[in-house]
Amino acid sequence: MTDTQVTWLTQESHDRLKAELDQLIANRPVIAAEINDRREEGDLRENGGYHAAREEQGQQEARIRQLQDLLNIAKVGEAPKQSGVALPGSVVKVYYNDDKSDTETFLIATRQEGVNEGKLEVYSPNSPLGGALIDAKVGETRSYTVPNGNTVQVTLISAEPYHS
């Protein structure tokens, strides 16, 4: 498994997501009972409560699958140990298109992790910018394509392990 297939999580984020998953799983019998109660009300074609409970069940099961998938590929508390290389879990500073005054600092991670709570912008390692920077060394310039089809050059100024 490569680092771009792994989701880096702080221990706090992992614990929060695991608690949410546990709560959703514990809630399964409640929704199942609600569906059963609504089913007993009669004609299912005109039973809004039944359909609402089924919709809620579908949304809950989708979130359970999403959390299970995320937690299965997560690296917990393993921020990159090295500085100078852009990896998932790194705070990077870059400039764009040879304009050294146009700098940006951000975290390479996934937004749903809940890391840094708005202190830094977060770019996924699977995004065009994040993907272009993975394994880049300080001073290295990479290119990526933006949604309008243009190519942007980005140069890595610094890369440090994330510390919450």
UniProtKB/Swiss-Prot annotation:
Q: Record's Pfam families?
A: GreA_GreB, GreA_GreB_N
* Coiled-coil stretches noted in the UniProt entry, renumbered to this chain: 50-75
- Write down the InterPro entries for this protein, in alphabetical order: GreA/GreB_C_sf, TF_GreA/GreB_CS, Tscrpt_elong_fac_GreA, Tscrpt_elong_fac_GreA/B, Tscrpt_elong_fac_GreA/B_C, Tscrpt_elong_fac_GreA/B_fam, Tscrpt_elong_fac_GreA/B_N, Tscrpt_elong_fac_GreA/B_N_sf
One MF annotation (Gene Ontology) recorded for this entry: DNA binding
Where does this protein come from, organism-wise?
Mycobacterium leprae (strain TN)
Q: Does the keyword rRNA-binding apply?
A: no
Provide this UniProt record's keywords sorted from A to Z.
Coiled coil, DNA-binding, Transcription, Transcription regulation
Q: What's the name of its gene?
A: greA
UniProt protein name = Transcription elongation factor GreA
Q: What's a GO biological-process term for it?
A: regulation of DNA-templated transcription elongation
Question: So what does this one do?
Answer: Necessary for efficient RNA polymerase transcription elongation past template-encoded arresting sites. The arresting sites in DNA have the property of trapping a certain fraction of elongating RNA polymerases that pass through, resulting in locked ternary complexes. Cleavage of the nascent transcript by cleavage factors such as GreA or GreB allows the resumption of elongation from the new 3'terminus. GreA releases sequences of 2 to 3 nucleotides.
Lineage top rank: taxon: Bacteria
By sequence similarity, the record places it as follows: Belongs to the GreA/GreB family.
